[in-house]
């Protein structure tokens, strides 16, 4: 966090110098109240590959099954890479940064919310499935959004109007991450999981 103050000072003294700073989340920085270079920085999000980037190497089936994360795409064992990504990045980073008090509840939340991928998000239903308070699930969703792992797309309406209840749709940022988080039972039909 202290580096941002140094970057700010250098930018103030020499406008021609530019920096590229990377990170997985600004959540910890915001909580610490550090200098976020207001008005001097651009926020760019890096997303998984898109078909056009891969051109002839693109496989629709591979993209739907394993996703398009650069670390996973083309790996000898994509499933192992996805599991490692989820364990190391999502679970361990959340635990290390102390973002959740009960990692067991958060793990149940990840499994429960995986069933909401591509659907309207009912925070109350997910909270009931996890056995936690609604406010806890709201916080968990905010963590996933801050880590750029998921997003909620708001309901679209042509005209501005007051809606008493409107649930946005929940999406994980990558199909491979979603499929790896989603629990599979012995009677699950893969085509049903895929939405066919």
What are these regions (language model features)?
Residues 18-24, 45:
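Structural recognition of the conserved hydrophobic beta-strand(s) that form the central parallel beta-sheet
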Residues 24-29, 49-52, 177:
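Conserved nucleotide-binding/hydrolysis micro-motifs of P-loop NTPases
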Residues 3-4, 30-32, 55-56, 75, ...:
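Short glycine-/acidic-enriched loop or helix-start segments at secondary-structure transitions
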Residues 9-10, 27-42, 57-59:
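Short regulatory helix/loop adjacent to the ATP-binding pocket of P-loop NTPases
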Residues 80-196:
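Accessory nucleic acid-recognition modules appended to NTPase machines
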Residues 56-89, 95-99:
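Amphipathic alpha-helical "lid/sensor" segments that cap RecA-like P-loop NTPase cores
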Residues 2-20:
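Conserved Walker B catalytic segment
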Residues 42-55, 76:
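Conserved AAA+ ATPase "SRH/arginine-finger" region at the nucleotide-binding site
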């Amino acid at each position: 966090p202290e580096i941002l103050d140094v970057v700010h000072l250098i930018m103030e003294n020499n406008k021609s110098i530019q920096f590229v700073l990377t990170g997985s989340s600004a959540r910890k920085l915001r909580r610490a109240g550090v200098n976020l270079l207001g008005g001097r920085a651009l926020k760019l999000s890096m997303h998984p590959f898109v078909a056009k980037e891969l051109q002839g190497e693109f496989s629709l089936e591979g993209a739907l099954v394993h996703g398009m994360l650069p670390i996973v795409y083309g790996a000898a064992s994509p499933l192992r890479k996805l599991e490692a990504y989820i364990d190391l990045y999502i679970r361990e980073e959340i635990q290390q940064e102390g973002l959740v008090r009960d990692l067991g509840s958060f793990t149940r939340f990840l499994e429960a919310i995986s069933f909401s991928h591509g659907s309207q998000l009912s925070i109350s239903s997910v909270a009931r499935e996890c056995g936690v308070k609604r406010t806890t699930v709201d916080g968990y969703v905010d963590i996933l959004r801050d880590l750029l792992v998921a997003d909620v797309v708001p309901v679209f309406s042509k005209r501005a109007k007051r809606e008493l209840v409107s649930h946005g749709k929940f999406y994980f940022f990558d199909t491979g991450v979603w499929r790896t988080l989603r629990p599979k039972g012995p009677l699950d039909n893969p085509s049903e999981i895929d939405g066919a």
